[in-house]
Regions:
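Long, histidine/aromatic-enriched segments associated with O2/redox biology
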Residues: 1-257
Length: 257
């Protein structure tokens, strides 16, 4: 984040000693700071340096996902196989490397500028639906979130019937323009492509609502139906106050307006 991390003088806009890391204005994640829209929001003094937190408990149907991926592979191009089909739906391979070619010195430094129709990374793939990178106006950086995932439950192959999933934690400064925007306007909107106008797309196959999408593989194009494999079983929207506010509360002092 700008103001928290040092900028690389040789690559303006990039973080020093972190190839591929783009600096984003702190106001996207920390209240009271300049945002990517070059606006400095007015917030109460005690809120400055705080953040808004999203916590979701996500139950994952691993067996259902695997069965669907195998069926999709057979339907589109049998020679592709389920592992390749799964990579196309997610946008990354099993080892985490993206399907998109890197534009910088590290694999995770990539965009979709050379893939407007989604022939390499399908426009309906999970990582493209939730972060279209070089496509959309204004910049996708105005809808970013800072997030982490905490898995729970045993590995699927060890205990297939056990409950498993992910505790999703994110930080932002506007639920409507960041977290909920990603869900509503990108992941769940079957018409949003994150690519060229008219590019084949669909709903997000991983976290989206039930729907479908278009995937090309093995020289064939398939229209796939997606059901829900990830369900929210608990959620919290919370305010994370700044340390300064916590100190005032601990001392029994009033918060400044």
């Amino acid at each position: 984040m700008r103001g928290f991390h040092r900028e690389d003088p040789a690559r303006p806009g990039r973080r020093l000693d972190h190839p591929g890391a783009v600096l984003v204005n702190a106001g996207e994640f920390v209240l009271g700071h300049r945002t990517e829209r070059e606006v400095e929001p007015v917030v109460a003094a005690w809120l400055r340096d705080g953040s808004i937190q999203v916590v979701r408990r996500l139950s994952q149907d691993v067996a259902g996902w695997r069965a669907a991926v195998e069926a999709h592979a057979r339907a589109v191009a049998p020679e592709v196989g389920p592992e390749r089909m799964g990579s196309l739906l997610v946008g990354r391979r099993l080892d985490g490397t993206p399907l998109a070619r890197p534009t910088g010195p590290v694999e995770n430094d990539f965009d979709y500028a050379d893939d407007p129709l989604g022939t390499t990374t399908p426009c309906t793939s999970h990582i493209r639906k939730t972060n279209p990178r070089s496509f959309t106006d204004p910049s996708p950086r105005t809808h970013r979130i800072m997030r982490r995932g905490i898995p729970f439950g045993p590995p699927h192959d060890a205990e297939p019937g056990a409950e498993r999933g992910l505790v999703f934690v994110a930080h932002c400064t506007s639920l409507a323009e960041q977290f909920e925007f990603q869900q509503r306007a990108w992941a769940n909107d079957p018409s949003f492509a994150g690519g060229a106008t008219g590019a084949p797309t669909g709903t997000d196959p991983v976290i989206g609502v039930e729907g479908g999408g278009t995937v090309e593989a093995g020289g064939s194009r398939g229209e796939l139906g997606f059901r829900r494999f990830v369900r929210t079983t608990g959620a919290v929207y919370a305010l994370v106050p700044p340390v300064s506010a916590l100190r005032l509360l601990a001392a029994g002092r009033p918060l400044p307006r």
